[in-house]
């Protein structure tokens, strides 16, 4: 997973949570927000921003689980699926993903209606996945999440505030009216873990 400058909360939200009105510590708070965002990515083993666009899609390579499907990283929109059945790194078998009858189906099928990405592609048309060689499937498109979930935004605000106040709390305890008392340590705040538990998945699958 590549590092990103995308963050999941704002400077204003964290300052409001900490009841800070001046701008003296803005740079330090912004650094805490960035660190908290990447901690969330690592904990969930996925990211909540988007990589790639329709004009400049991102590329991933996968090893099929079976002839019938591949498990993928989070996909918002697919722009190309190509396979390399001869294992010559040509990826010249281009699947139909635009005009019915399609060669693919996406799962979980209802995820877009819930604001979630797809994580599996099924072969339902003219081809099967060449599963006997590794990295024989090339997928291009937009990866990540359609929008940052509210729970992730809130988790990032809490975690960023905790990281910022840590340097000011030599006894390991800090707090504010909004955040309450927070015990500071090297792991995510328990409230943050609770907010994020629904979003955790296995380690990224792209090669």
Walk through the language-model features, giving the residues of each.
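Divalent metal-cofactor coordination and adjacent catalytic microenvironments
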Residues: 1-207
């Amino acid at each position: 997973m590549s590092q990103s400058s995308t963050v999941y909360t704002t400077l204003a939200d964290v300052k409001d949570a900490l009841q800070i009105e001046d701008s003296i510590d803005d740079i330090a708070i912004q650094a805490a927000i960035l660190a908290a965002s990447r901690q969330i990515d690592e904990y969930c083993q996925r990211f909540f921003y988007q990589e790639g666009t329709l004009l400049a899609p991102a590329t991933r390579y996968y090893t099929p689980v079976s002839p019938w499907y591949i498990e993928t990283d989070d996909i918002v929109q697919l722009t190309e699926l190509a396979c390399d059945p001869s294992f010559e790194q040509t990826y010249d078998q281009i699947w139909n993903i635009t005009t019915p009858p399609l060669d693919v189906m996406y799962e979980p099928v209802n995820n877009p209606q819930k604001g979630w990405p797809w994580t599996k592609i099924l072969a339902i048309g003219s081809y099967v996945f060449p599963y006997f060689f590794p990295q024989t499937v090339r997928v291009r498109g937009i990866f990540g999440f359609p929008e940052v979930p509210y729970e992730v935004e809130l988790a990032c605000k809490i975690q960023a505030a905790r990281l910022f106040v840590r340097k000011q709390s030599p006894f390991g305890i800090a707090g504010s009216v909004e955040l309450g008392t927070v015990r500071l340590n090297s792991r995510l705040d328990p409230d943050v873990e609770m907010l994020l538990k629904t979003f955790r998945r296995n380690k990224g699958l792209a090669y």
